Amino acid sequence: MSTVGKVIKCKAAVLWEANKPFSLEEVEVAPPKAHEVRIKIVATGICRSDDHVVTGALAMPFPIILGHEAAGVIESVGEKVTSLKPGDAVIPLFVPQCGECRSCLSTKGNLCIKNDLSSSPTGLMADGTTRFTCKGKAIHHFVGTSTFTEYTVVHETAAAKIDSAAPLEKVCLIGCGFSTGYGAVLQTAKVEAGSTCAVFGLGGVGLSVVMGCKAAGASRIIAVDINKDKFAKAKELGATECINPKDFKKPIHEVLTEMTGQGVDYSFEVIGRIETMTAALASCHNNYGVSVIVGVPPAAQKISFDPMLIFSGRTWKGSVFGGWKSKDAVPKLVADYMKKKFVLDPLITHTLPFTKINEGFDLLRTGKSIRSVLVL
């Protein structure tokens, strides 16, 4: 029986309020409106950014369906959709690509103005309404994607068509974690061969930064984490050295400066803590070092630092979705994965049924997982 043009009832993980477990509910998913597509989600990763909403570190409206790193198949399309059709394999994009705003038109930009992750997220579609209801209540969208559900609706500019032969339970990581880390190196920092790099934080995104540094030909890749259990994987993926800040009496930026002579060429903060952001900045060369903020900064916290850190010549950059123009880059990244130009399997430590979403988040919070993928 065709579902086209009809409301679909399906299972979703609803977060009714902060600091509570996800609740598996039956939700109604409305048909896509003009320029929108409805996607049957096949696999979705659990990312630290989702947990930031649970803890309140990332402010979002409630109730909400989280999830933003996924892959699925187009179930139906709304009017005026031209780039996608039912049956297409797709990856939803939390950074859309409208192709018309200044960021999209600039060779230097990728943060499309149509995103819903900037300073005041609405949790709604472009027309100011939601496509999800549960128990008679409107449920908010998350960064234009909402993938912790069997079906979701996204704007046409927020989905990239990919190779239908790609394993969706692997390439879903290209929807966030892998691309964010890998691109921070290749697109944002533009690390050169022979460079020295430091990577703060060895979760899924941090390990993807390590992979990017190796791909760029960095000669030293120093991985920094307080969980030494992550060091073996970091070395497997390209880290040349691994250090634990807890093993030293002096600040970690001093340790790195001593290890490298005058500091690293490039540092990457992939945790989302203001203390490590300033430490990463201080760790890079005082005159030409580049430090990139990759971890999502905590809401309502301000950063203070010695301006001499910048005055001497350092560059401090941010990177959203690895600097990739999403709709253009994601199909190419999937193609590169299919050509074995990089691996994703080492990042996926757990594959769980969707019903075990709360267990997946527990694995993340206790540091026992790198990436858990939920299969719907």
Curated annotation (Swiss-Prot):
What GO MF terms are annotated?
A: all-trans-retinol dehydrogenase (NAD+) activity; zinc ion binding
Protein name per its UniProtKB record:
Alcohol dehydrogenase 1
Coiled-coil spans are none
Q: Which cysteines are joined by disulfide bonds?
A: none
Single GO biological process annotation from the record: retinoic acid metabolic process
The top of its lineage is: Eukaryota, Metazoa, Chordata, Craniata, Vertebrata
Species for this entry: Gallus gallus
Q: According to its UniProt record, which reaction does this protein catalyse?
A: a primary alcohol + NAD(+) = an aldehyde + NADH + H(+); a secondary alcohol + NAD(+) = a ketone + NADH + H(+)
- Which CDD domains does the annotation name? alcohol_DH_class_I_II_IV
The question of whether Zinc is a record keyword is answered with: yes
UniProt: Zn(2+) 1 binding residues: 47, 68, 176
Q: What is its main location?
A: cytoplasm
Q: Where in the cell is it found?
A: Cytoplasm
Keyword Lipid biosynthesis in the entry? The reply is no
